[in-house]
Amino acid sequence: DLHSQRRRQRQMCIRDRHTPDALKNSIVESKKLETSNVHVLFGCGGNRDRKKRPLMGKIASKYADKATVTDDNPRYENPARIREEVIGNLKNISEIGNRKLAIKKAISELKRGDLLLIAGKGHEKFQSIMGKKFPFDDVKIAEKYLQKK
C-alpha cells in the first residue's frame, strides 16, 4: 500500500484503487483492522469504463461505514456527471467535488479509532482536467490536514 499513517488513534490509508473489486477488497480488509468505522473517499476517472462507476458506488455504500464521492481525474468529462453516475439513487453517499475539500472534511470528521481510506489516485502527483495536469498529491494534502487534527 502506498501510504498509511496513524495519528492520535485516527488512521488514514491512501491506495491506488480503480476497480470495483480493488475498492471492495480495500474496504473489507480495512474493516478487519481494529477500527471503529471505515470511511472511504473515492472518485472515478473520466474517459474510462463508465460501467464500473455505479458498481463502485454500490460497493462503497454497502461495505463502508461512510462514503464520499469526489473528483479523481475527470479528464474531458464533466466531473459532476461522473459523480452522479457513481451515486445513482444511493442515499448514503455524500458528494464533494473538490478533492482537497473532500479530504479536509473527511479528516475533520474522523473520530478516535476511525480509519479513512482515500482510494483512487494513490501515488499520482497531478489531477487531469480538460487536457491539463494540475499538481495534486493526496498524501501531502491528507498529511497537512491530519497534522491539524
Model feature map: region roles:
Residues 1-3:
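Short, exposed "boundary/linker" segments that immediately precede the start
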